């Protein structure tokens, strides 16, 4: 007893410091904090010092305090066994280990399973044993593995600050299963054909939100692969790039279609009317035109226009009043029967206005140019032909009225195209006979005129060339 008391007295006099006496509240459970410090390390002290100084650059005491602190924080935190570095073979679970540093690019590339040497020939990581035909696919696999490992390393940087540095025994099977599942997923994706992988580049609209969602893009084929420039592409990849090259041509065609759409629509509507595509519409328009023209034969144009406008207003007003009456007797909603036509947007965009103005201006300019060509005698022959035409019209005007000619023209427009479609072969045969007879008569006349006989064969040749063109 005499020897023990001075020892306790000495302990009482010496104050405890934070570095000599660890706090029980900071360390947590003693077994969980220090149970790994009693086992032997696999590496030597020199290697441990080099590794510690190289990775962390701090003394060993900081490493020990980090392990003690990590035991408390990581006990309740989430442990993700997939993003941790793989444990070296030959080290038991109870062995102490240094805290996992942040994985650098070199460590990530060395730890990729696909880059390690495989005992099986033709596997990944052995480019010499890979057949030349499979080298592009092998390089694509390696790049996808590197991208997946970089994502895992970025996720492990966030989880390593809160998770325990030493995995437990019951977590090891889950980590192995997760890593195997990830590898299987990656291999299944790589086993798909290349054209299916490139289809992931196109965005898809989600049915609920309508927001385009893009699949995970696969790396595009670059020039730094092992394939040469003359190596043929696979079928799926070649077709994909061919479609991509054709896209600008398609867009250019669509742009030209949009520009000519404004001018082609009226022509198509007129053609449908003249060819009687819709019998009811063509019949109604033909009847209305003929009735109006026949009325103009007996009445003035002012009275005909006023009567037609009054008839249209009577029809629309009566229909509107009828809907109001149905609303008053609670048998209708009273909406305007012409609301659909009132809601139609008749405004022209800036592009349509510019195109329309350009077309009108071009027609006006061409008409003025032709009139100047004929009446200012730019070409004597053309002016004489126009004079002959007006001379013939003087006799026609003495026999027929202008409205009569218009009526005959309307009848011809609604009958001749339909008849020509139904009897095209016979009409072409008779037209060919007539044109041949006319050309023969012209040749005889030119042969009798002095000075034009040598020009007749050249004119016939040029005419045949023009017909062929």
Curated annotation (Swiss-Prot):
Any S-S bridges, and between which cysteines? none
Residue ranges of the region described as Disordered: 1-180, 201-238
Instruction: Name positions with the PTM Phosphoserine.
Output: 44
Q: Where is the composition biased (Basic and acidic residues)?
A: 32-43, 135-144
Instruction: List all Low complexity biased stretches.
Output: 14-25
User: What is this protein's tissue specificity according to the annotation?
Assistant: Expressed in brain and spinal cord (at protein level). In the embryonic brain cortex, expressed in neurons but not in astrocytes (at protein level).
- Reticulon domain spans which residues? 270-469
Subunit field text: Interacts with SPAST. Interacts with BACE1. Interacts (via first transmembrane domain) with ARL6IP5/GTRAP3-18. Interacts (via N-terminus) with SLC1A1/EAAC1; the interaction promotes cell surface expression of SLC1A1.
Name of this chain's protein: Reticulon-2
Protein species of origin = Rattus norvegicus
């Amino acid at each position: 007893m005499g020897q023990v008391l001075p020892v306790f007295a000495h302990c009482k006099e010496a104050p405890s410091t934070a570095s000599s006496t660890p706090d029980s509240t900071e360390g947590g459970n003693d077994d969980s904090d220090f149970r790994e410090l009693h086992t032997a390390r696999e590496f030597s002290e020199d290697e441990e010092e080099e590794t510690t100084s190289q990775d962390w650059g701090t003394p060993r005491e900081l490493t020990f305090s980090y392990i003690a602190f990590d035991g408390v924080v990581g006990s309740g935190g989430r442990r993700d066994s997939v993003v941790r570095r793989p444990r070296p073979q030959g080290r038991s679970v109870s062995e102490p280990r240094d805290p996992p540093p942040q994985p650098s690019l070199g460590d990530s590339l060395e730890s990729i399973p696909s880059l390690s040497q495989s005992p099986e020939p033709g596997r990944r990581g052995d480019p010499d044993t890979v057949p030349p035909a499979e080298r592009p696919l092998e390089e694509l696999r390696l790049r996808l593995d590197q991208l997946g490992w970089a994502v895992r390393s970025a996720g492990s940087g966030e989880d390593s600050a809160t998770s325990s540095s030493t995995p437990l025994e019951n977590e090891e099977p889950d980590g192995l299963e997760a890593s195997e599942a990830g590898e299987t997923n990656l291999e299944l994706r790589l086993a798909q054909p290349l054209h299916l992988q490139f289809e992931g580049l196109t965005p898809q609209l989600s049915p609920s939100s309508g927001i385009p969602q893009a699949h995970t893009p696969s790396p595009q084929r670059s020039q730094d692969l092992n394939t040469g420039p003359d190596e043929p592409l696979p079928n799926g990849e070649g077709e994909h790039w061919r479609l991509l090259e054709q896209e600008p041509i398609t867009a250019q065609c669509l742009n030209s279609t949009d520009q000519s759409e404004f001018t082609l629509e009226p022509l198509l509507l007129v053609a449908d009317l003249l060819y009687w595509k819709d019998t009811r519409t063509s019949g109604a328009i033909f009847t209305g035109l003929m009735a109006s023209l026949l009325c103009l034969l007996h009445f003035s144009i002012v009275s005909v226009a006023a009567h037609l406008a009054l008839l249209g207003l009577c029809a629309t007003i009566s229909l509107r009043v009828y809907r109001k009456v149905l609303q008053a007797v609670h048998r209708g909603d009273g909406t305007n029967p012409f609301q659909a036509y009132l809601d139609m947007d008749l405004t022209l965009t800036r592009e349509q206005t510019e195109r329309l103005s350009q077309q009108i201006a071009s027609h006006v300019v061409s008409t003025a140019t032709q009139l100047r060509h004929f009446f200012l005698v730019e070409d004597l022959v053309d002016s004489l032909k126009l004079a002959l035409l007006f001379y013939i019209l003087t006799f026609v005007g003495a026999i027929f009225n202008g409205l009569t000619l218009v009526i005959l023209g309307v009848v011809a427009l609604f009958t001749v195209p339909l008849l020509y479609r139904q009897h095209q072969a016979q009409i072409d045969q008779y037209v060919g006979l007539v044109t041949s007879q006319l050309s023969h008569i012209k040749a005889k006349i030119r042969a009798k005129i002095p000075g034009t006989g040598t020009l007749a064969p050249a004119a016939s040749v040029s005419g045949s060339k023009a017909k062929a063109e």
